[in-house]
Amino acid sequence: MTHLKDLPLHTLQFYATAPYPCSYLPDRQARSQVATPSHLIHNDAYSDLVLSGFRRSGMFTYRPYCDGCRACIPLRVLVNSFQPSRSQRRAVKQHQNLLARVLKLCFVPEHYKLYLRYQTGRHAGGGMDHDSIDQYTQFLLQSRVNSRLVEFREALPDGTAGALKMVSILDVLNDGISAVYTFYEPDSSAGYGTYSVMWQIEQARKLGLPHVYLGYWIEGSAKMNYKARFAPHELLIDGRWQAPSDFTR
């Protein structure tokens, strides 16, 4: 069982937010449980928090704490037994010409412009398509844990890096990689999002890490339901990571 009382987190405090409109399910109210203070949430503490279903947005570490709703279920891919589907293998083949460069978190104007194009093309009207540089920085480039920025560029004929196509933010935890956020050229047919997850699974394998944490799976949300296509995976139900076949609503 993975409960907060069992973890070495006695120095942290937890509070519940007031209700706010749910970002994923229409006509629902959401609440979050927030871990504070942020300066004490180092990589070991955050790794433990992720085991209990927490995520981070910048310096904000939270998990769903909604009244009467359990739709947001943490999901992690089992790296060593992962079996890609035909469409996932196709995404890897389609983007085998991308060159990945792993960086520390840093602001690059070209990344920010791609972020705005992505928000406008894929999530127009969602409130993030007009994010300022400060908002972008607070959301993606602030972290007290072991975070990385990965940029993916198209390879030119001479093997050098060309046009920017995608950026992924990830955290390297004690037992896996946590996918924070990915944005890319908003071409709906390109399969960049699938390729990003496949790349992170392969990176976890190279690092000897058994899991890739994809955040919350929400069965009724088209934006989140795709995560269940990466199999085998486990869901965090009632404090225990378990196979989907063991879970009955």
Swiss-Prot record:
One of its GO terms (biological process) is ubiquitin-dependent protein catabolic process via the N-end rule pathway. It comes from the Bacteria. It is an enzyme of class 2 (transferase). The keyword Transmembrane does not apply. The keyword Transferase applies. It is found in: Cytoplasm. Pfam families: ATE_C, ATE_N. InterPro entries: Acyl_CoA_acyltransferase, Asp_Glu_LeuTrfase, N-end_Aminoacyl_Trfase, N-end_Aminoacyl_Trfase_C, N-end_Aminoacyl_Trfase_N. GO terms for cellular component: cytoplasm. Its main location: cytoplasm. Its EC number is 2.3.2.29. GO terms for molecular function: arginyl-tRNA--protein transferase activity; leucyl-tRNA--protein transferase activity. Functions in the N-end rule pathway of protein degradation where it conjugates Leu from its aminoacyl-tRNA to the N-termini of proteins containing an N-terminal aspartate or glutamate. NCBIfam families: PRK01305.1-1, PRK01305.1-3, PRK01305.2-3. This is Aspartate/glutamate leucyltransferase. It comes from Variovorax paradoxus (strain S110).
